[in-house]
Each structure stands twice: as C-alpha cells, then as structure tokens.
Design a protein with these regions (language model features):
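Fe-S-dependent hydro-lyases/dehydratases of central metabolism
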Residues: 1-257
C-alpha cells in the first residue's frame, strides 16, 4: 500500500534501547562487538526500520547502542520550543511536547518540555492521521523528599509544576531526576518551567544558538518563563511548599517514601 496514508502528522522518534546483549565485556572492542552481533541477530528488523525511516516523513530511528531513550531525548531530540512554517509561509513558534510509550517519559519535564508516558496504542493514535489507530545532600535525597511529600498530598492523575526561588538551586540533572520519578509519586507529569538552567543545558548539549534564543524569547513572551519574583508566579489550583533547606539525607525502603 501507500505508506503516505499513515504518515505521522507529528515528529516521531523511535529509539532502540535496552536491546544490545552483552556477549563480550572488559575489552576495548566490547561495545562495537556487541552492537555488531545485535545487528546480525536482528538484521531483518533493522532493515525494515531503515525502510520506514526513509518511507515516512516525520519519522526517524535512533539505532541501538546510542543510549536510553529518555537520555537521548533530553540530550539530542528535544528543543523546548519548535518552529515551523504555517500555511501562509510565516514561521510560527510553539512549545515542545512529548508523548512517549514509557512511564518515565516524564524525565523530559526537567527541560521545560511537557511530556508523559502512554500506552503504545495511545501513542499511535496521537501521531497517525484520522485516528487510524487508537552540602552532602544529593539529588537523590531531594527526590525522596519530594516523592514522600507528594504521595502524602495526593497527586494521582495530576499535572504537577515545580516553581519558586528554590528551583535556581537545582541543576538540569536534578530536575530531570525529579521529573523522571513522576510515576513514583503518582502524578501524570512533574513539569519544570523554562529558565536560565534550561538554556544552559541546551547550550551544553549542542543545541544551536538560534534555537536557544528562540526558546528564551518565546518562553518570555508567552509567559512560560520562570521568574524568581513570587509576584510573577502563576495562580495554581493547589500548592505545596517544600523548603530545600530542610532536606536531610534520606534512605528509601519498603513503602517509604
């Protein structure tokens, strides 16, 4: 049939991770050898995926051995703000979003990108046209405290946004870790707004200066930018306060946090 009939209407990235078996280890050539064996064992599958990446628009394949899908998305795929031409040819900027097929898709929330995990069928329904298919305190300590606090508060099925002056103390890695744990505290996602730390990480991971400038300008203009001044905070349905300074070394255990 005609592949264009089911061409994705939004960009789709298929990241092949958790696939390379460890046949060789402890040698300089171990990685290359393991990836080579992976291709040999699954050649027919990879040939099909290669065809798909050429047959469809808006579809790309990230090969095995590249990294875990959430980290690949964080470092290489996500832009925070996208731009494209509308029907008149004018360039339009719009916020990046991500619908993933894994519960820890929420990791990308740490970059200011709204994203969460759904089932495979639900993801297909989202992109196929016409609904053809239905000091001494670590980031871990903070995460455990956040998880415990949000579990007690009750955020199942909620969108949680982190805000306030304490965010400037959190690196992108810290934010991504907290966002990644959204399934553990029960929220649909744990979102971090775009701010200077977002821009620094985009620059660190090789995003273009043009994309970074667009992200900042768009976020400020549309009200997505995070300010330290509390007078500029959004009005939320419910709020929960956590003083980062009160976080102590923590240890997780059965049912705790």
């Amino acid at each position: 049939g005609n592949a264009e009939q089911i061409n994705p209407q939004v960009p789709v990235h298929l990241v092949i991770d958790h696939s390379v078996m460890v046949d060789e280890f402890g040698t300089p050539q171990a990685f290359e050898h393991n990836v080579e064996l992976e291709y040999q064992r699954n050649m027919e599958r990879y040939e099909f995926l290669k065809w798909g990446s050429k047959a469809f628009d808006n579809f790309s394949v990230v090969p095995p051995g590249t990294g875990i899908c959430h980290q690949v998305n964080l470092e290489n795929i996500a832009k925070a703000v996208w731009s494209s031409a509308d029907e008149s040819g004018a360039m339009v900027a719009y916020p990046d979003t991500c619908v993933g097929t894994d519960s820890h898709t929420t990791m990308i929330n740490g970059l200011g990108v709204l994203g969460w995990g759904v089932g495979g069928i639900e993801a297909e329904a989202a992109y196929v046209p016409d609904n053809t298919f239905e000091v001494n305190i670590t980031a871990t300590d903070l995460v455990l405290n956040v998880v415990e606090s949000l579990r007690k508060h009750g955020v199942v099925g909620k969108f949680v946004e982190f805000y306030g002056p304490g965010l400037k103390e959190l690196s992108l890695a810290d934010r991504a870790t907290i966002a990644n744990m959204a399934p553990e505290y029960g929220a649909t996602c744990g979102y971090f707004p775009i701010d200077e730390k977002t821009l620094e990480y985009l620059e660190l991971t090789g995003r273009s200066a043009q994309d970074i400038a667009l992200t900042e300008a768009y976020a400020r203009e549309q009200g997505f930018w995070r300010y330290d001044e509390t007078t500029k905070d959004a009005i939320y349905t419910k709020t929960l306060e956590l003083d980062i300074g009160t976080v102590v070394p923590s240890l997780s255990g059965p049912k705790l946090p």
